[in-house]
């Protein structure tokens, strides 16, 4: 069978952008590692071969953003940054600033030629230590389901406005 779709890690599990995209905050926080050296050439080759391009963007599991913007991260009740059993910090899915960053990455991927943005880790950490997390006033009375649904709707509107499609991996 012929290849008809390709999923490329654009923002990986470690929080790094793997190719050059126009996302000022990513540059500001140092989350750019351009493993893909010539994205325009890759996109052009895929388009010439009618390959549907999907940009995988890891959402709330983002240790770089959590460390560089600690006010956007999950915190334990003692005020320290929450870390999962692997020692990785996660960002707070209730924070609109986090939504904005993730939507900006997705929009930049669409503008770079991707057909779809696949958001992965669209969820809260499932680590048992999440019981210690204090969300403070960031919840604004919303449930976790409402936070995830809210992000998905927000990102969907932004990606569709940029001319792309969206999918999400939830747990």
Language model features with spans:
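The substrate-binding groove and active-site-proximal loops of carbohydrate-active enzymes
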Residues: 22-36, 86-100, 138-146
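Glycine-rich, aromatic-flanked loop segments that form ligand/cofactor-binding clefts
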Residues: 5-8, 37-82, 118
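Active-site-adjacent "subsite" loops/lids of carbohydrate-active enzymes
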Residues: 60-111
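Aromatic- and acidic-residue-enriched segments that line the glycan-binding/catalytic groove
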Residues: 18-30, 62-84, 125-139
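Aromatic- and glycine-enriched glycan-recognition loops and surfaces
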Residues: 1, 28-50, 143-153
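A mature extracytoplasmic/lumenal domain signature
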Residues: 10-14, 21-23, 57-59, 121-123, ...
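Aromatic-lined carbohydrate-recognition surfaces of secreted/lumenal glycan-active proteins
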Residues: 52-62, 118-119, 142-171
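Catalytic domains of carbohydrate-active enzymes, especially glycoside hydrolases
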Residues: 1-16, 108-118
